[in-house]
Amino acid sequence: MAAKIRQNDEVIVLAGKDKGKKGKVTKVLATGKVIVEGINLVKKHQKPVPAMGVQGGIVEQEAAIDVSNIAIFNAKTGKADRIGFRFEDGKKVRFFKSNNEIVSN
């Protein structure tokens, strides 16, 4: 199945503690989850690893969020949108369903 959400896409959170916040996708995981910049921050208790020079303590980092809880953000309409696929000049492209604009990659 083709990926509707890709790395560097601007997305908006639809459900959860960060509902309504916007961010950029930094990583797409194969498990159907994504990591979004500045969204779903969790505190991780990091053990020190002197051999690697890693300091211990409580570190705040982004956790994965399910793809079903986010939607791509359409800058033209200013709202969350759905993605469709079509072929143009022999290439498969993504487009916004609300206004048929092609999503820039």
From Swiss-Prot:
Gene3D superfamilies: 2.30.30.30
Any single Pfam family the record assigns to this protein: KOW
Gene Ontology cellular-component annotations: ribonucleoprotein complex; ribosome
Any one GO biological process: translation
Keywords: Ribonucleoprotein, Ribosomal protein, RNA-binding, rRNA-binding
Primary role: One of two assembly initiator proteins, it binds directly to the 5'-end of the 23S rRNA, where it nucleates assembly of the 50S subunit.
Subunit structure comment from the entry: Part of the 50S ribosomal subunit.
Similarity annotation: Belongs to the universal ribosomal protein uL24 family.
NCBIfam families, A to Z: rplX_bact
Protein known as: Large ribosomal subunit protein uL24
Organism: Vibrio cholerae serotype O1 (strain ATCC 39541 / Classical Ogawa 395 / O395)
